[in-house]
Amino acid sequence: MRKSKVLTLGFQHVLAMYAGAVIVPLIVGSSLKLNAEQLAYLVSIDLLTCGIATLLQVWRNKFFGIGLPVMLGCTFTAVGPMIAIGSEYGMPAIYGSVLASGLFLALFAGFFGKLARFFPPIVTGSVVTIIGITLIPVAVQDMGGGQGSADFGSLSNLALSFGVLLFIILANRFFTGFIRAISILLGLIFGTIAGAFMGKVDIGPLLDASWFHGIHPFYFGFPTFHLPSILTMTLVAIVSVMESTGVFVALGKITEKELTADDLKRGYRSEGLASILGSIMNSFPYTTYSQNVGLIQISKVKSRDVVITAGFILVILGFMPKIAALTLLIPTAVLGGAMIAMFGMVVSSGIKMLGAIDLNNHENLLIIACSVSVGLGVTVAPNLFDHLPDSIKILTSNGIVAGSLTAILMNFLFTVGRKKQDESHASAENVHAA
């Protein structure tokens, strides 16, 4: 394949995942009130780490790397938990929890086959649904212009946000292939241009940003560790691994490569290493991006060279704050419109997982009902368990942790019950037959 074609296809992969890669640091940074300089650094270092994480996964060796043409980017599943952790304990606590969850993935990658039975679709589907629903209020606030903004809910903000949402919907309705894959990115560009004509774009951060910068490990301070935060991010890591497994299997079929348990172990370990790197570099947990799988199907090009090129492009972009500062031009309302579509898709992903189970089974419905309700309840009323001992509050202070544990425990309870009933029923049948 010609080098020019490899470079072009590499840029396509970068464009397909670019919106997802930059929107996570933008949302988290904006929610935690970072200034323009900090936001620009957060976005640029995230692009850099996305590139390195991708290269770690594509580079197959004895210890890590699945060796498939897969792109890694920030996981949306972690957005809500990171905002909650940052609001409660500060940015260093985010990186402490990301570091701990990354170590967990890297060290116990070989045991995920055994852990998977505790995280069937009814558990992972409930967790992803809870995470998606708890993110929606963040998107709605931004649609209005951002919490506390003087023009919150103004007609101009609503026109921008709903205009972007409509653009994304129409792009998915009337286009397929690559255009559909970058519909979010196109929506952000469209909304920013419209916002500029409405006087809602400030080019100051772009002008102030330098063209190149160095890397500053622990830019936001040395990681701090808090058990509730670590538990939350570890659950997020497990859910992300379950999602990645589906992407790995899909890519294995596309590339006609039969995956072994050892392949999956190296893939999981790479995600753990990427998260460890993310915590050191002031970035986020990483997971495989399914939109790039669709791009491989569209282009019919299965070469790892294309994805390796995309990884190096991201690394180069990560050293250029001026490129990252372009994302700071996006008006908050525009971001909110895109977030509605993106976070809604997180909810849809959770519902899709739940679609794999028997919804005619009353016990399954009860598990979903209780876990989602507990998760949302704790999110809405976080002080509900303030009078409980600290050792218990660790497990109940976060809606995602509380809802996830509810799903895990209820699934275990009903699964054990069903096995015992089945064994008793089988014994009774044997006695009757005798």
Swiss-Prot record:
Main location: membrane
The organism of origin for this protein: Paenibacillus larvae subsp. larvae (strain NRRL B-3650 / LMG 16245)
InterPro entries referenced in this protein's UniProt entry, alphabetically: NCS2 (IPR006043), UacT-like (IPR017588), Xan_ur_permease (IPR006042)
Family, similarity comment: Belongs to the nucleobase:cation symporter-2 (NCS2) (TC 2.A.40) family.
Role according to the record: Uptake of the purines adenine and guanine, and the pyrimidine uracil. Transport is probably proton-dependent.
Keyword annotations of the record: Cell membrane, Membrane, Transmembrane, Transmembrane helix, Transport
A Pfam match: Xan_ur_permease
PROSITE patterns assigned to the protein according to its UniProt record, in alphabetical order: XANTH_URACIL_PERMASE
Molecular-function GO terms, alphabetical: xanthine transmembrane transporter activity
Mode of membrane association: Multi-pass membrane protein
NCBIfam families the UniProt entry points to: ncs2, NCS2_1, pbuX
Membrane-spanning ranges: 9-29, 39-59, 63-83, 93-113, 118-138, 159-179, 181-201, 218-238, 306-326, 327-347, 365-385, 394-414
Regulation (activators, inhibitors): Inhibited by the proton gradient disruptor carbonyl cyanide m-chlorophenylhydrazone (CCCP), but not by the sodium gradient disruptor ouabain. Hypoxanthine, xanthine, cytosine and uric acid act as competitive inhibitors.
GO CC terms in record: plasma membrane
Superkingdom to which the source organism belongs: Bacteria
UniProt name for this protein: Nucleobase transporter PlUacP
Subcellular location: Cell membrane
